[in-house]
């Protein structure tokens, strides 16, 4: 026999007529909220999970300086747009530098203003770090340092970008023997005319873990010696640390007085190129065998590397740049004006050069090496 089915009885509590309006009022009218100043409202958990209020587009973010700039921006809670032309796998190292969804990647074409516009239309800050060590069939120095920066500055101006940061070079000069430095000088002029409120930064040679300065000289040992024009005793360098340059860029973004100014970023000490390279080999615990090489012979070697199908170790233009004395520009503000204390080369060179040591000297202390000889700031 089938079991009897007993329907469930749902009981509803009686509600008085006077309670109905009160219930409706509680549903449709939320209680008053406290008015708090934005300064006392927490913005994230701090670090990269905070909110800096900066939305920055960084052109050239996959390069040497770019990865440091993106890291600093992401670490302070900024949203960073990274336009790139490379394979997506070549940008993987940038993804962990910001919180989830804060590092945004997009393809772009330096010759297409529409793609530039898509990259900057939502940004309050645009940073141009586009650069190239040597010319290629697709992009020469005029394209990289003049036309593309001018296009980025123009589109940024039209899009209403608040701050534009352009990276040039300390030795940029229209009369330079280096096409690289001549193009940098023209690019500065074009950016200033297109975006008068832009902040232009002129760093000296930058050294860091992935640089093409200290590593360049350390790798010369594979050629059996160190070729230098006039033994490097007629060239003066004042290299600056990569982290100091990055801090200067970030502080220039925060400083409202930096708009429309040009800054010169240099290290605290000046060195003869001979003494600097000698110090590089001393830190690497490698034999230093310098020899003078005529200017025309060094350029001929550079030309051989240029026509090679592989990445050139040096070029004729790089020969000119490394033998160009760094300028002294006392009329321009520097790192100290942005609250950054320049780091001495002797404190950070080991980070770059330790990998050039043999196993025997791998853990040797930096104190075992005599500091490089310096010259006065008013030197040659």
UniProtKB/Swiss-Prot annotation:
Keyword terms of this UniProt record: Acetylation, Electron transport, FAD, Flavoprotein, Mitochondrion, Respiratory chain, Transit peptide, Transport
N6-acetyllysine modified-residue sites: 189
N6-succinyllysine modified-residue sites: 175
Membrane-spanning residues: none
Family per record: Belongs to the complex I NDUFA9 subunit family.
Function statement: Accessory subunit of the mitochondrial membrane respiratory chain NADH dehydrogenase (Complex I), that is believed not to be involved in catalysis. Complex I functions in the transfer of electrons from NADH to the respiratory chain. The immediate electron acceptor for the enzyme is believed to be ubiquinone.
Main location: mitochondrion
Transit peptide range per the UniProt entry: 1-35
Subcellular location: Mitochondrion matrix
Cofactor binding, per record: Binds 1 FAD per subunit.
Any one biological process term the GO annotation gives: circadian rhythm
GO terms of molecular function: NADH dehydrogenase activity; protein-containing complex binding
PTM summary: Acetylated on lysine residues. BLOC1S1 is required for acetylation.
Assembly and binders: Complex I is composed of 45 different subunits. This a component of the hydrophobic protein fraction. Interacts with BLOC1S1. Interacts with SLC2A4. Interacts with CLOCK. Interacts with RAB5IF.
Protein name from the UniProt record: NADH dehydrogenase [ubiquinone] 1 alpha subcomplex subunit 9, mitochondrial
Pfam family, one: Epimerase
Gene3D superfamilies assigned to the protein according to its UniProt record, in alphabetical order: NAD(P)-binding Rossmann-like Domain
Cellular-component GO terms for this entry: mitochondrial inner membrane; mitochondrial matrix; mitochondrion; respiratory chain complex I
Cofactor: FAD
